[in-house]
Amino acid sequence: MMKIIAFVGMPASGKSEASRIAAEMGIPVIIMGDVIRKEVLKRGLEPNDSNTGMVATDLRKHEGMGAVARRCISQIRETGSELVVVDGVRGIAEVECFRKEFGKGFILISIYAPIEVRFSRVQKRGRSDDMNSIEGLRHRDERELSWGMGEAIDASNVEIENNFTLETFRKDVRDVLSNYLEADLEK
């Protein structure tokens, strides 16, 4: 059975770092935000927070709340891997879409970090679609919560707290992923 491990969490909680760790472990990673960023560029828009949010909302409005997840399923299958990590679930409809497609093989891991910690990270990472104030981060949190992010977080199988050092977080993520990787290898 194919196993999908998806990360869910508020912006800058550590999903991308967790995905980097998975990639270092040799696990293929599908980044849901890349679907949105690709669509932003396809529409000829500048890749900033406003346009990214507008396109994400538009896709969900016209294709349903599971639109981004549905666009990722073929990419997941194309990896040919029995274990794939998905970075960036944004709502309960996406969780339901993945659970319908992969059944018990879908595992959801939520990553938690307080807003002050997340904003500090946003300031350091310098992505073009990032927000430049804590109010901007709160606005993005509200937008993502409107997509069912809170329900998705509540539906997670495992929670990893990312409120400590990077080394602690990396160890926690490796431990959780190793458990699933070992279970996969034992089959």
UniProtKB/Swiss-Prot annotation:
Domain of life of the organism encoding this protein: Archaea
UniProt-listed HAMAP family: UPF0200 (MF_01111)
GO molecular function: ATP binding
Gene3D superfamilies: P-loop containing nucleotide triphosphate hydrolases
This protein's record includes keyword tRNA processing: no
Entry similarity comment: Belongs to the UPF0200 family.
Protein name: UPF0200 protein MM_1313
Listed InterPro entries: NTP_hydrolase-rel, P-loop_NTPase
Binding site for ATP: G9, M10, P11, A12, S13, G14, K15, S16
Keyword entries, A-Z: ATP-binding, Nucleotide-binding
Pfam families: AAA_17 (PF13207)
